[in-house]
Curated annotation (Swiss-Prot):
SUPFAM superfamilies hit by this protein: YheA/YmcA-like
Protein name, entry field: UPF0342 protein LCK_01004
Domain of life assignment: Bacteria
Family listed: Belongs to the UPF0342 family.
Originating organism: Leuconostoc citreum (strain KM20)
Transmembrane segments: none
Pfam families associated with the record: Com_YlbF
Amino acid sequence: MTVNIYDNANEMASVLKETEQYTAWQNAFNAIQADEEAKQLFTKFQSVQVAVQQMMQSQQQPSADQEKEWDAIAADVQKNELITALLSTEQALNTLLTEINDIVTKPVADAYAKLRQK
């Protein structure tokens, strides 16, 4: 019997959409999409995250003005209940995805564990 692992992966993607974690995340995401202020703030927050990540990768330090701007955006994000709900549900969804990844990659992890034991 031939197994098409991609069929299984696509089925898992469909099943994922039925989980409590995904449903909660989707609802939180939709709430932000429906609120223009939250949507703009979240977009700005994502831009800041990318900028910070790029600076870290290139080992640059942000200017004092950049730090002030980023801190202000982070403070606004923490005050916005729609965004904090999205971030919370995203964390729960990521936990589930990490657990699934651990299950899927267990044969590889077990093989390396056996290699270390010898």
